[in-house]
Amino acid sequence: MLRIKAFPRIHISLIGMNSDGYRLNGGIGFSIASPTLDMSFEPSDTVDVIDMRESGFTPEELDRLKKHLEKIIAKEMYGTALCCTICEGKIQSHVGFGSNSMIYQSCIEALLVLNHREYNENDVIALSGRGGTSGIGINTYFKGGLILDTGIANRGQRGLAPSSTFMSDVGPKPLILTELKLPQWDLGICIPSIVPKTEDEERAFFKTNCPIKKEEVESILYEVVYGITSALMEEDFDVFCKSIDTLQYTKWKSLERQLYGEKLIEAESVIRKAGAKCVGMSSLGPLLYFFGDDIDTTVDQIKKVMPSCICLKTSFNNSSRTVEYD
């Protein structure tokens, strides 16, 4: 049996969501140590995927994954398929963990191992079809740490849309500008009792809100480079927190946050009152991440006020996924 343990990512923000610049997309995010996504794989004659998570893939999403794997098996002439089990855990789909990329890449890597193929990171990324919009999750899977990418050159070949839109398009991958090992800081994550957005709703959001203005992108970029990345490199916790908070009110992130209205604002208020120094929303949410001086106490207070939420302490992760083969 083959086992892969992957670490989720927090996606701080997309960046170049304008259509009149040198590049498209780009983003910044980091890997966290827990909760982990644990998957097991066995060789099989046919592809099968069993999702044991309480909030996992829809039947349509499971079917899409199986068809993607079957297409690769046929194209690459693999002799062995696989039976994949996504184990129980707190990694939900479509809340901001980057679970889709983790699952697709884990399945591709398992296929390569079970078929005794030599491979590298780029092979797994290319076959997964992920990373068409953001290079965060596809790279933290292998590297951990913080990733800052500048998207792809704007040559009119793509529009602005979520990564799932580009899965059949083997195009250029985002350019990684910075890979950074992170300090030993704790943080908390909170998944409020808010219904997450579906892939169709995510596509509709991009269609409605893209492009944004170049000057709005510049505001995001200032916080990303001069604020968040620089503060992490210098381990300046106060500036990091200030920049995370400021970023929430830049154009793109504020549009994402508006999807959840007052419910998100109320959850964030509870987190701040519990002691958080800064609060951000990962990707399209509704997962909120937060930093502070005493994460344990903050988590306990949040659970008392919002008992229906999922809230836990974690930390930055600088490690790759783990692969074990019996």
Label for each model-derived stretch:
Residues 88-113, 132-141, 279-284:
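Glycine/serine-rich anion-binding loops at beta->alpha junctions
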Residues 286-288:
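Conserved PLP-binding catalytic core of the aspartate aminotransferase-like
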Residues 1-95, 109-122, 132, 317-319, ...:
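ATP-binding N-lobe of GHMP and related small-molecule kinases
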Residues 32-34, 100, 182-186:
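Short Pro/Gly-enriched coil loops immediately N-terminal to beta-strands
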Residues 2-5, 13, 19-27, 120-277, ...:
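ATP-dependent small-molecule kinase catalytic core of the GHMP/sugar-kinase superfamily
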Residues 62, 98-101, 292-295:
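Conserved strand-to-helix beginnings and helix N-cap segments that scaffold or border functional pockets
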